[in-house]
């Protein structure tokens, strides 16, 4: 099966997908389009959005649908209904945090960054820290000893917040250890080293 992932040359919504593919050593075409090219491509997309994953003849859009599709193919969706539901719940919590982050980044960065770091982020991370302790007391992955697609989303979310403020994880020790541990997974480490050489921006407006 030939895979082609289309997105901009930024982290954005595609980075957790790239992390998953890199970690599982899934071959794919990493198609990064410019904003000039996007004007021609946009009308052809199902919802006029990217990321878009071409899986053979199947076109899959929406970042959540893409990563869950890949999770099912790679054994990253839990082993029973309870685990799958927990993974989905954790993922949705991460999406809520990301929505607040992107709202600040794109709508009110200059005036909103400091209040976001001081008043919003600590509470959001504390909730995730508490939830992270559900399995194995937060010592491994989101559902304990087994990776899931939520781990890739969690790693990226923590990563971009460390770029925003280097002390972001000081109050959430389990999440901080998770981030450090996940970054040392051999395939993730290799991908991060390769990415560092390119150093793509996190967001499309150049903030971060």
From Swiss-Prot:
Regulation: induction: By manganese.
Residues annotated as binding glutathione: 7, 38, 42, 49-50, 62-63
Tissue: Expressed in dopaminergic (DA) neuron (at protein levels).
Domain GST C-terminal: 80-202
A GO CC term assigned to this protein in UniProt: cytosol
Keywords, alphabetical: Transferase
The reaction(s) this protein catalyses: RX + glutathione = an S-substituted glutathione + a halide anion + H(+)
Disruption phenotype: RNAi-mediated knockdown causes an increase in Mn(2+)-mediated dopaminergic CEP neuron degeneration.
InterPro entries: Glutathione-S-Trfase_C-like, Glutathione-S-Trfase_C_sf, Glutathione_S-Trfase, Glutathione_S-Trfase_N, GST_C, GST_pi, GST_superfamily, Thioredoxin-like_sf
Gene3D superfamilies, per database record: 1.20.1050.10, Glutaredoxin
Entry EC no(s): 2.5.1.18
Transferase keyword on record: yes
GO molecular function: glutathione transferase activity
CDD domains hit by this protein: GST_C_Pi, GST_N_Pi
Ranges for domain GST N-terminal: 1-78
Assembly description: Homodimer.
Job of this protein: Conjugation of reduced glutathione to a wide number of exogenous and endogenous hydrophobic electrophiles. Prevents dopaminergic CEP neuron degeneration in response to Mn(2+).
Assigned protein family: Belongs to the GST superfamily. Pi family.
Designated name of the protein: Glutathione S-transferase P
Organism: Caenorhabditis elegans
Gene: gst-1
């Amino acid at each position: 099966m030939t895979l082609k992932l289309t997105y901009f040359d930024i982290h954005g919504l595609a980075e957790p997908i790239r992390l998953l593919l890199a970690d599982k050593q899934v071959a794919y075409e990493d198609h990064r389009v410019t904003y000039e090219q996007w004007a021609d491509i946009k009308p052809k997309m199902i919802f006029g959005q990217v990321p878009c994953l071409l899986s053979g003849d199947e076109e899959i859009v929406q970042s959540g649908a893409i990563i869950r599709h890949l999770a099912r193919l790679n054994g990253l969706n839990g082993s029973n209904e309870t685990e799958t539901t927990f993974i989905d719940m954790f993922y949705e919590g991460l999406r809520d945090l990301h929505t607040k982050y992107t709202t600040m980044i794109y709508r009110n960065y200059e005036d909103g960054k400091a209040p976001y770091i001081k008043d919003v982020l600590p509470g959001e991370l504390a909730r995730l820290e508490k939830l992270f302790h559900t399995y194995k007391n937060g010592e491994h992955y989101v559902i304990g000893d087994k990776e899931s697609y939520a781990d890739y989303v969690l790693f990226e979310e923590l990563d971009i917040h460390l770029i925003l403020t280097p002390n972001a994880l000081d109050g959430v020790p389990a999440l901080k250890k998770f981030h450090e541990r996940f970054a040392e997974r051999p395939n993730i480490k290799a991908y991060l080293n390769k990415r560092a050489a390119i150093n793509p921006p996190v967001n499309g407006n150049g903030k971060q």
